[in-house]
Design a protein with these regions (language model features):
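Bacterial N-terminal signal peptides
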Residues: 11-19
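Bacterial N-terminal signal peptides that target proteins for export
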Residues: 1-12
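Sequence/structural signature of beta-propeller domains
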Residues: 23-387
């Protein structure tokens, strides 16, 4: 995915400098960013060349490793909460269940693989026995969306063990060349059962899928009563990120480029809605203001300094993190010890810890700095003395 944006801000450039943190010891209303893993030497304590444009993050509540989608290398790589890599890595398939020869390898821009790897985005851990890996009787453990218009599933016990399997292929829907572009993925439950919700940035819709109903094992398109409609979202904006927060679906909207494939960043370019899991609009949560291609959403823990328990919404456009009350009132943006906005270039996921060797009070993030050419996995924590 290429991204329309301006030059890197000075604050964001620090993320991939040789130092290991952004911010300094600060008062409890200040925050520090600590890189854990990057594909660039010197940008974090640990290096992994496959971690390029790190996007979706998921893990099991039982304390599995953090699974991270590597959008530029068609891979899901695994790390503990201190950034130590786990041996397993999973290749995400292209349409037709094709695995690129470049999948799970450091991208070589001078000699790109043919075909290019898949482009995974959102990811969920699946607790349901209903969503199986297609062609098997094995419940999916992790499910992945892609900009290629596919959704795929993986579980232990597959053969080959390191490949996910296509469960939805809308790469040519409605037609070849203008197929779905899935930017985000969430799971939710309503009275009809458990469903997957994928943000289709190209069509401007939320695509909904239930478990397989046929012999091919592919997940079935489903409808909701509400349809995820907000007539007051301006033309040219489309669903971008999505997250299940306390049982409701928070959906971010970003401005589409001419191809309806990528976002157009800019201050005020963004909206956030809250829907129930049957697609009814509950409320407009946030509009324009400091939003700038918002994507990542989480609720902070109750041990997160000044902003404990608040809703955090990260901007992909400028890397800043907006803090909201539950009613959608903007409180502030996260700042470092010097009062500068925390800014993480190419910010994607924000999530509380809970994976292996992590604290559930710590916010973890993924990012694709330098126009999504690189990758970063790290933490955000409150600190105790402002400069």
């Amino acid at each position: 995915m290429s991204h329309v944006s301006g030059c890197l801000k000075a604050a964001t450039a620090v993320v991939l400098a040789a130092g290991l943190t952004i911010g300094y010891a600060a008062h409890d209303d200040a925050y520090i960013v600590t890189p854990l893993v990057s594909n660039l030497a010197g940008a974090a304590p640990k290096m992994d060349g496959v971690l390029q444009n790190a996007w979706g993050i998921a893990f099991s509540p039982a304390g599995s490793p953090f699974w991270i989608n590597d959008n530029a290398t068609g891979c899901a790589t695994l790390y503990d909460g201190e950034g130590t890599k786990v041996t397993l890595q999973v290749s995400i398939p292209l349409p037709g269940n094709v695995i690129s020869p470049g999948a799970c390898r450091s991208a070589n821009h001078n000699n790109p693989s043919n075909p290019a790897p898949a482009a995974p985005t959102g990811m969920v851990w699946n607790a349901s026995a209903a969503f199986l890996v297609p062609g098997t009787t094995i419940p999916a453990a992790f499910i992945f969306s892609t900009e290629d218009g596919t959704i795929s599933a993986w579980a232990g016990g597959l053969n080959p063990a390191n490949n996910a399997v296509i469960a939805v292929d809308n790469s040519s829907t409605p037609s070849a060349g203008v197929g779905a572009v899935y930017k985000g993925l969430a799971l939710g439950v309503n009275v009809k059962g458990q469903f997957l919700f994928a943000t289709n940035f190209r069509s401007g819709r939320i695509d909904v899928f239930g478990p397989s109903g046929g012999s091919n094992g592919l997940y079935m398109a489903a409808t909701t009563d509400g349809g995820f409609i907000d007539h007051h979202i301006p033309a040219g904006y489309a669903p971008f990120g999505i997250a299940n927060i306390d049982g409701d679906l928070f959906v971010t909207y970003a401005q589409q480029d001419k191809q309806h494939h990528d976002d157009v960043a800019g201050t005020g370019h963004g909206f956030v809605d809250v829907f129930d899991t049957d697609g009814h609009l509950l409320r407009r949560f946030a509009s324009r203001g400091t939003l700038n291609s918002p994507w990542g959403i989480t609720r902070a823990s109750f041990d997160f300094g000044r902003f404990s328990g608040k809703i955090l919404i990260g901007n992909f456009g400028d890397g800043r993190i907006n803090v909201f009350d539950d009613d959608g009132t903007l409180i502030d943006q996260l700042e470092d010890a010097y009062g500068n906005p925390v800014a993480i270039d190419g910010l994607w996921t924000l999530t509380l810890g809970g994976g292996r060797n992590s604290s559930s009070d710590t916010v973890y993030f993924s990012a694709g700095p330098n126009n999504e050419a690189n990758g970063l996995f790290g933490t955000i924590t409150p600190v105790s003395h402002r400069k």
